[in-house]
């Protein structure tokens, strides 16, 4: 039986990659006192991030970017790590969707896939928050780099993004 890993130590700001430093400055400006943590390995998937943090996969607030088909507006869905996003539900909220490739993600958010933070984008996206995240007391979100994350509550996530909370999960 393996031990649950302990949460990695907070990173010094000067040790953070540029995208994570950007997020750290934004969080500080918002009065958010939780430090950014660097994962020992990538957090590109919810399972990898949860394993590195020793938390439940559901606590990973994953950021998935889509492109609104009508006008190329970025659409950010922040979903629980255990949920698959139901694109039909998202489209019902914002209009028809198209896939966002890595170039679009980087251009619109300033971050690479796997490190998209819920805040601090180059172009402000339309954002939706998975209602399942509000059932949890603590979340971890990407902090601008695939190895960087920060801890927050669902209430803080809603306040930081100003996004509506909706049902976006694909249900059986």
Model regions: which residues?
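Extended, low-hydrophobicity, polar/charged segments
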Residues: 2-172
């Amino acid at each position: 039986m393996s031990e649950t890993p302990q949460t990695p130590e907070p990173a010094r700001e000067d040790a953070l990659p540029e995208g994570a430093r950007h997020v750290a400055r934004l969080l500080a400006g918002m009065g958010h006192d939780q430090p950014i943590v660097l994962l020992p390995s990538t957090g590109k998937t919810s399972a990898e991030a949860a394993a590195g943090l020793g938390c439940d996969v559901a606590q990973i607030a994953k950021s998935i970017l889509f492109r609104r088909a009508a006008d190329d507006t970025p659409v950010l869905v922040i979903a629980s790590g255990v949920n698959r996003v139901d694109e039909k539900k998202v489209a019902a909220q914002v209009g028809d969707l198209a896939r966002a490739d890595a170039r679009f993600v980087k251009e619109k958010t300033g971050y690479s896939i796997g490190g998209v933070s819920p805040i601090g984008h180059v172009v402000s996206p339309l954002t939706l928050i998975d209602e399942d995240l509000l059932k949890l007391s603590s979340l971890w979100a990407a902090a601008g780099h695939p190895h960087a994350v920060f801890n927050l509550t669902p209430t803080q996530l809603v306040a930081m993004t100003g996004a509506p909370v909706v049902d976006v999960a694909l249900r059986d």
